[in-house]
Amino acid sequence: MILGPYIAVSPLIVISLGGALLMLAEAFSHRREESHDRRSGPSSDMALGTAITLLAGAVFSGAVGFVGPETLEGFDSLAPYLVMDRFTLFFSFVLCLGGALAALLAGGYLPEHRLDRGEFYPLLTFSTVGAIILAGAGDLLTLFLGLETMSLGAYALTGFRRTSPRSTEAAIKYFLLGSFAAALLLYGGALIYGATGHTDLAGIGEAIAGAKGAAAPNPALLLIGAALVLVGLAFKVSAVPFHMWTPDAYEGAPTPATTFMAVAVKGAAFATLLRVLLGAFGSPALSSWAAGWPPAVAVMALLTMTVANLIAGRQESVKRMLAYSSIAHAGYLLVGVAATVRASEDAQASVMFYLLAYTVSTVGAFGTLILCGSRGAEAVSYEDLSGIGKRHPVAALAFSLFLLSLAGVPPTAGFFGKLYIVKAAMGAELYTLSVALLLNSVLSAYYYLRVLVYMYMREPAPGAPIARPMRSGYVNAALVVSAVLVMVLGIWPTTSLGIAVRAVLASR
């Protein structure tokens, strides 16, 4: 079938063409310096165009991966460089969905905060393209290409508020630490190539396993290279102790950019982490509990969720608290990654479902934070949310739903995400990590419920400005979609989990 490979990469083609059109629209548009109606400024049309582009990418990902035929000729035509299998297409759907919702949030946020510059949207679109390439990378060179394409856009989005010293500082920190992590990953890849003679993940795995008469790789080069690659990817998923950039970057960036980084950058990094660990490093030489990567991932999981939850409870900034919450969720996901050694299919599917549930819950939480801000000012502290439950009950109810999902309270999507992770960990006999995850979930309830206390049980301080949530159709649309998906995934979780299992089995 001649069109096979083009059908497989159709999400990338659609998003890339849409991003190019967005750049042209921005370049040739005649923008007004100041719009009389800030909600109909130049970014409004760009936000809608970006959301449509990324939703089209999500539709193509779902149609090609899960509605089309069980087998598609040409799926492996781009291998080993880019593997557009059902595993990649599942993540492509999640990444496009997260990017589209972030674009809708930006459509309301940017004009409100006088950041109405259209270049935000092409940056977000092409960063999503890089994220999909990263998720489907079957070669270390493609992995690095996707990583940098995604990261360069994320760096620019972090510093998008150019007049803010905090935003500039956050962007510089993110860029410097991100470049250092990328250099470590690149050097690790070079060492792995020197040890195995391969850059494709399948070839690396065969060389390590000694398949097809391959010469035994140099163990010292291999271990050092694998460790450096793991460190580089741990930085992208915000695992402790490589998380220091996350709170500053998330707090300093415009909130829609923070949302995109929290869902798309993290999601793509976990996709490639699974592919690298189970593909290139899946042989017994590197996947044993005695001398392989599972102990390192397990320790990172334990540290990440515990340290992040302890620090999150001490924050006075709600946005910074959500940043540490994002780090804690990376720890929960790492528990699922560690479980893939002994319960591969169930653990991978649980990670994929958790990322979908985490994406819609996180978008909703940051989106409601945008909505609860006063006109032209963000809701930053807990005090800023005082009394929201009485003055704006719908916004408070939405925020409560998303926070309860992040806390893992039934019947939300977040509850079943954690349930499936714990089930996979128990099946892999990771009892310590399972108990630690449950205890950390209880610990996280403190800072999530603290927000509810301020919204429903506290009154604003005397003389404090009364918050008047913005009226934005784009933000409201993103919140409605997120809320519906949180409840749908919570009421019918087995459907999405079954799709994830199909994706895992089809990628083998």
Swiss-Prot record:
The keyword Zinc does not apply. One of its GO terms (biological process) is ATP synthesis coupled electron transport. NDH-1 shuttles electrons from NADH, via FMN and iron-sulfur (Fe-S) centers, to quinones in the respiratory chain. The immediate electron acceptor for the enzyme in this species is believed to be ubiquinone. Couples the redox reaction to proton translocation (for every two electrons transferred, four hydrogen ions are translocated across the cytoplasmic membrane), and thus conserves the redox energy in a proton gradient. The chain crosses the membrane at residues 2-22, 47-67, 87-107, 126-146, 175-195, 220-240, 260-280, 291-311, 321-341, 351-371, 396-416, 431-453, 479-499. The keyword Translocase applies. It is an enzyme of class 7 (translocase). InterPro entries: NADH-Q_OxRdtase_suN/2, ND/Mrp_TM. Keywords: Cell inner membrane, Cell membrane, Membrane, NAD, Quinone, Translocase, Transmembrane, Transmembrane helix, Transport, Ubiquinone. It is found in: Cell inner membrane. Its EC number is 7.1.1.-. It comes from the Bacteria. This is NADH-quinone oxidoreductase subunit N 1. Its main location: membrane. GO terms for cellular component: plasma membrane. It catalyses: a quinone + NADH + 5 H(+)(in) = a quinol + NAD(+) + 4 H(+)(out). It is a multi-pass membrane protein. NDH-1 is composed of 14 different subunits. Subunits NuoA, H, J, K, L, M, N constitute the membrane sector of the complex. Belongs to the complex I subunit 2 family. GO terms for molecular function: NADH dehydrogenase (ubiquinone) activity; NADH:ubiquinone reductase (non-electrogenic) activity; quinone binding. It holds the Pfam family Proton_antipo_M. HAMAP family: NDH1_NuoN_1. It comes from Sorangium cellulosum (strain So ce56).
